[in-house]
Amino acid sequence: MKNILFISGFLILISIQSSFAQSSLDDEIILIQSSFGMDKKQIIEGYMDLPESIAPSFWSIYQAYEAERTMLARERMNIINDFLTEYDKIGNDEANDLAKRTLKNDLELSKLHSAYYKKFKKATSALDAAKFMQIDTYIHNTIRNAMQQELPFIDQ
């Protein structure tokens, strides 16, 4: 399972890197999120292996969750883009702004997870809700870590 997730994440990163030179930031974000959403859903569907009796409720909540999470991912990409654009001239004000925006984005993602954990638990079970949160967090942390490795450190 880890190999499938790593390969999926790696392929997404390759498409991210090649698409940055081809279109505007918003077009790239839409392209990445639409292709990632399909791959991610397939991974989650295979991992969750939900019974037919609860699958429709789960996927309905999942769609709403993904819509909100995608907006947070879009903001994260904007923060990264701003960092890369301003990298050569980052001073105290720019660093402060980027740090505050990143912390706010992290907090909003935690709030989203908390709110949707309750919804998933109500529609399925605590076990299924925890299982979803675990795989979702794993997927996104894998991708975030791979992206972070490509970013330069401030003032280096």
Language-model regions: role of each:
Residues 1-27:
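Bacterial Sec-dependent N-terminal signal peptides
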Residues 28-31, 35, 47, 110-156:
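Amphipathic, charged alpha-helical segments and their helix-to-coil junctions
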Residues 38:
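Active-site-adjacent substrate/metal-binding segments within catalytic domains
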Residues 5-6, 18, 96, 126, ...:
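Hydrophobic alpha-helical segments
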Residues 17, 66-69, 140-143:
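A short hydrophobic/aromatic micro-motif that marks alpha-helical segments and, especially, helix-coil
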Residues 29-30, 43-123:
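Amphipathic alpha-helical segments
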